[in-house]
Structures are given as structure tokens and as C-alpha cells.
From Swiss-Prot:
Entry function: Catalyzes the attachment of glycine to tRNA(Gly).
UniProt KW keywords: Aminoacyl-tRNA synthetase, ATP-binding, Cytoplasm, Ligase, Nucleotide-binding, Protein biosynthesis
Gene it is expressed from: glyS
Biological processes per GO annotation: glycyl-tRNA aminoacylation
Compartments in which it is found: Cytoplasm
SUPFAM superfamilies: Class II aaRS ABD-related (SSF52954), Class II aaRS and biotin synthetases (SSF55681)
Name of this chain's protein: Glycine--tRNA ligase
Enzyme Commission code: 6.1.1.14
Keyword S-adenosyl-L-methionine attributed: no
Coiled coil (UniProt feature): none
Any one GO molecular-function label of the UniProt entry: ATP binding
Any Pfam family matching the protein: HGTP_anticodon
Organism: Methanococcus maripaludis (strain DSM 14266 / JCM 13030 / NBRC 101832 / S2 / LL)
């Protein structure tokens, strides 16, 4: 067995991970978390919450997983949320084209076009792994799970492909909550869905998974000189830039360069200080939950693999024994793509008013509507026209005035309808105005975390074995069981003392497990396998002087302390 098989075997035996729907044969791309796995995953999530909600001042929202078609049409997911698909001509089995190539040829398919993937399959004579048949042409496959809202299927919808859209849709409400003062951040943690073509990587590639995403809204002019960056500028990280990825003269080791965030921004490797700051937050979080620093790197997306909404994106990749480097976190500059898209398609104003450092005088057009004529012409839509005219920027206003002067009419397109405006509908004149601020569409920095992949990597990076034991060396922040409590023997009042101590630990918010089964060595072994950092034994000495033996998992060191000092000692160590 390789390390992955050993970990999966342990996690199934000890209640971390189980195949979903197992008694019905199981379905690829779905896993259940057992009792300890659920605690481990929640500890990862709660550590993430600490970093983003407590430390960074973001607030959390919770929105539906079912998302109307028009929302994901506006966001670009209907057109762009796809993977390359190949289907066998004989057995009709489907596979991801890029994955099937990488399994047969030592080549990186990241960012390749459909045509390039097709040429690779033909050049290397790649056949169906199931029956040996030829493949059909490479095509695209939309990864969203389709559904409908209500009876009759009249309202098309999807299971959300990301949690982010729920935040963008509620932007006006979130902005009001923050008193419309940039910058501010919102997070959402929950299920997202990808109808993966052929998920064959266990817990690494799931069809239903948990995301933790933050959306940090900022004035685009503040990204270059980001106030918080000063606190992390000297942090050194292993960076795999887009430029180095494309430099064929460099070896794979030479392509990854360790440098400070300050130098990375100064040299134009990372786009700006704001995205660099959230790369640093990501590093801090991953270190706290026990990720091996030597198995972490940050890789920049190449231009041809960048998401449709992103201006720059860096993935935190974690190394795994079987699957190599896997993407676990994406830190992206989404610009104002999403807010603009939802403004255009919903008709709602998703701008924020920002005050200028200094007031200044400008010349601007002031419009006076002929309400009687406009009301008679557009009836109930007259108000829509009035509001739409107010939202026009200087350039659009110039276009309107020029068209009315030269052609006598202008067509104003809005999300609700097109308005043909005639010259007699309004009067436009230039006036001098004192400007104290302006409306802007904020840009978004998005740190997006795949919690299931991260949780698996926490387990793999914690997994250690030698001649006499197997250990899950979890960090104290995420270990599911904090303390094991054992009576040395099941007599002389030891079980009662041990049970009482276990209850005291739990009353103090610590998950403690009582175990009186088998030899003390086997009990230590069971606790080592589930990553419990401390074990406490009640023995004969306890009956004499009320002291107990504490054993530390990693060092195996044992020492005695008074029983009434156990709770404060453990809490201090954790």
C-alpha cells in the first residue's frame, strides 16, 4: 500500500472518512465524514473563521445552495464553468481529456485548448482505459448540476458551483451593514457542487464539497498601497510565477523561487499588495492547521488558464504522496467583474459612494425631464428611465446629448428595456458642481479554500509511522480528541476517578475520551492513530497522592502532575 491507501484505511477504521452510499455500491465523487472526521473538518473551518472573522474583521453570511439560472448566466458560469470531455466510441465511457492525457504521457496539460488536447490524444494514440476503444473528438462539458424550482420545471436553476455568488447578490445589503464604507469583507462557508466527468482521485476530487470563501471589497485605487501589507511584507514564500512556468530552460526545482512578498510585488511577480496580503493570510492559516511547510508552494495561473473573472490568481498548492501538487486555495483578483455583471443583468445599482480627499469643482450635465411627455410615452417605466439617466457617466451623457443634437433621438439600453429618447423628452444643460465624492464599483480580492482537500492534506501531512506505531501528528488546533483518559486497571476506584476527570475536561470545553479496554500500550496506540496530543493515566500513585501521569503524543515523554492541575495544564498547552 502507498501512503494514500494507508491513510484511507486508517481513516475508515477510526471514523474519519467513509465512502458515501456504501451499502448500495457507492458513487465516485462522494465521501462521508465519520465522527472524528467531522470534528477534524469543523476544527479546520473554525480555525479559518478565526483568521478571517476574528483577525481580519470579515462577517459571515449563509445563502441558499440552489441558485436561479439567471444568476449564473450573469456571472458567466453557464458559458464558462466547463471541463474538456472525451467519450469512448465503443463503451461510451466519459473521461476528462486533460486527465486521461496526463495519465498516459508525462506532460502538463494546464491551459491547453481543446484542439491541443485533441492533437495530444491522436499523437500518443491514447485509448479508452476501460475497453481500449478510440475516443470521440474532445468537447466541453458544463460542470453544474441542473435542477428546477417548483413544480413543472418552469424556473431553471443549478446547485451552486461556488459560494461567492451568494455574497455578490447580497452586496447592497452587506454594504449597508458596513455603513457603505470601503474596504470590507464578507465570507461564506458551505456546500458547492461540480458534476465532475470521472472523479477518480478519492477525496481530492468530489462532486459535492465544502468551500470557505472570502470576498474583500476595495477601491481599486487602494490595491497598490494596501495598509495591512506592511505587517507581512517580509514573509518569504515559495513562488512559482507564470513567467517561470513558461521558461523551458529552468528545471522544475529552479522554477520555484523563495522570495519576500515585498520583492514579489516590487518585481511585478504578484500584481499588487492587496492580493499579496491575502496570500500571506493563507500561509498563516495553513501553518496553524498543521500543513507541512516544505509541501506548500504558491503557483500563479497562466493567462490561458485564468478564470473568466480574474485579473490575477495564485493557488496555494499542497504536495501529496500519490497525486503530487494539488490546488487547495485560490487567491484571485476578481476585479469588479461580478458586480458589473449583476448590475447589468438585474438593473440594481451595486456601486458605493466614496469621499474624495479634496472637494473640487466640475462641469457636468444636468437633465430636466418633460415628465408629462415621458410619463405618457413610457407609463410605468418612466421611473426606470429617470433612474437610468441619473446613473450615466460623463462619457455616456456626452453621447446622449450629441445624439439628440445631431439625430434628434438616442436609444438608452437598460436591463429592463430599451428606451428611445426623443429630443423633446428632456433638456440637458451644463452646470458647475462641487464634487465631494464619486460612485465606484468596488474590486474584489477573493481567497477561496477547498476545505475537503485541505482536510485530507492535514491528514496526510500528519501521518507518520515507524516500526512500533502509527501516528496522526495533528496540530493542537485541529486534533479531534484533545485528551485520552485511562484507568490503569478497572478496579480500586480508578475508573471512577478517570471518568470524573474526563467529565471535568469536557465541562471545560475539551473533547476527552475515556478508554478502559485492553493493555495501556494498546490504548496509547489507539489515541496515537487518531492524533490525540495528550493521554492521562490514573494509577496506584493517584490513589496515594492524587497525581496522574501525562503522556505527550509526539515525544512520548511521561511526567506526573497533581490531578487538580490537569485542566489548566492541558488548556494552556492547547
Amino acid at each position: 500500500m502507498d501512503k494514500y491507501d494507508k491513510i484511507i484505511d486508517l481513516t475508515k477504521r477510526r471514523g474519519f472518512l467513509w465512502n458515501s452510499f456504501e451499502i448500495y455500491g457507492g458513487i465516485a465523487g462522494f465521501f462521508d465524514y465519520g465522527p472524528l472526521g467531522a470534528i477534524l473538518k469543523n476544527n479546520v473551518i473554525n480555525t479559518w473563521r478565526k483568521h478571517y472573522i476574528v483577525n481580519e474583521g470579515f462577517y459571515e453570511i449563509d445563502s441558499p445552495t440552489v441558485t436561479p439560472y439567471e444568476v449564473l448566466k450573469a456571472s458567466g458560469h453557464v458559458e464558462n464553468f466547463t471541463d474538456p470531455l472525451v467519450e469512448c466510441k465503443d463503451c461510451l465511457e466519459s473521461f476528462r481529456a486533460d486527465h486521461i492525457i496526463e495519465e498516459n504521457v508525462d506532460v502538463d496539460t494546464e491551459g491547453k485548448t481543446l484542439q491541443e488536447l485533441q492533437e495530444m490524444i491522436e499523437k500518443n494514440n491514447i485509448r479508452c482505459p476501460k475497453c481500449g476503444g478510440e475516443f470521440k473528438e474532445v468537447s466541453t462539458f458544463n460542470l453544474m448540476f441542473a435542477t428546477s424550482i417548483g413544480p413543472g420545471g418552469k424556473r431553471a436553476a443549478f446547485m451552486r458551483p461556488e459560494t461567492a455568488q451568494g455574497i455578490f447578490i447580497q452586496f447592497k445589503r452587506i454594504s449597508q451593514f458596513f455603513r457603505n464604507k470601503l474596504p470590507f469583507g464578507a465570507v461564506q462557508i458551505g456546500k458547492a457542487y461540480r458534476n465532475e466527468i470521472s472523479p477518480r482521485q478519492g477525496v481530492i476530487r468530489l462532486r459535492e464539497f465544502t468551500q470557505a470563501e472570502g470576498e474583500f471589497f476595495i477601491d481599486s485605487r487602494k490595491k497598490e498601497n494596501f495598509e495591512k501589507f506592511e505587517s507581512v511584507k517580509d514573509m518569504v514564500l515559495p513562488l512559482l510565477s507564470g513567467k517561470n512556468q513558461e521558461d523551458e530552460s529552468l528545471s522544475s526545482e529552479e522554477k520555484v523561487v523563495k522570495m519576500s512578498l515585498s520583492d514579489a510585488v516590487k518585481n511585478g511577480i504578484i500584481a499588487h499588495e492587496a492580493i499579496a496580503y491575502y496570500i500571506a493570510v493563507t500561509k498563516k492559516f495553513l501553518m496553524e492547521i498543521g500543513i507541512d511547510e516544505t509541501k506548500l508552494r504558491f503557483r500563479q495561473h497562466l493567462p490561458n488558464e485564468m478564470a473568466h473573472y480574474a485579473a490575477d490568481c495564485w493557488d496555494a498548492e499542497l504536495y501529496t504522496d500519490r497525486y503530487g501538487w494539488i490546488e487547495c486555495v485560490g487567491v484571485a483578483d476578481r476585479t469588479n467583474y461580478d458586480l458589473l455583471a449583476h448590475m447589468k443583468n438585474s438593473g440594481d445599482d451595486l456601486s458605493v459612494f466614496v469621499e474624495l480627499d479634496e472637494e473640487h469643482e466640475i462641469e457636468a450635465y444636468e437633465i430636466e425631464l418633460n415628465y408629462k411627455l415621458v410619463g405618457r410615452t413610457f407609463k410605468g417605466d418612466a421611473k426606470v428611465l429617470e433612474e437610468s439617466l441619473k446613473e450615466l457617466d460623463d462619457k455616456k451623457m456626452e453621447e446622449l446629448v450629441e445624439a439628440l443634437e445631431t439625430e434628434g433621438k438616442y436609444v438608452l439600453k437598460t436591463c429592463k428595456r430599451d428606451f428611445e429618447i426623443l429630443k423633446e423628452y428632456l433638456t440637458a444643460k451644463k452646470v458647475k458642481k462641487i464634487v465631494k465624492g464619486e460612485k465606484i464599483i468596488p474590486h474584489v480580492i477573493e481567497p477561496s479554500y477547498g476545505i475537503d482537500r485541505i482536510t485530507y492534506c492535514v491528514m496526510e501531512h500528519a501521518f507518520k509511522e515507524d516500526e512500533d506505531r502509527t501516528v496522526m501528528g495533528f496540530s493542537n488546533a485541529v486534533s479531534p480528541i484533545k485528551v485520552g483518559v485511562f484507568p490503569l486497571v478497572n478496579k480500586e476506584g480508578m475508573p471512577e476517578i478517570a471518568m470524573d476527570l474526563k467529565n471535568k475536561l469536557r465541562e471545560n470545553g475539551l473533547i476527552a475520551e475515556y478508554d478502559d479496554s485492553g493493555a495501556i500500550g494498546r490504548r496509547y496506540m489507539r489515541m496515537d492513530e487518531v492524533g490525540t496530543p495528550f493521554c492521562i493515566t490514573i494509577d496506584g500513585e493517584t490513589l496515594k497522592d492524587r497525581s496522574v501521569t501525562i503522556r505527550e503524543r509526539d515525544s512520548r515523554e511521561q511526567f506526573r502532575i497533581p490531578i487538580n492541575e490537569v485542566v489548566p495544564y492541558i488548556k494552556d498547552k492547547l
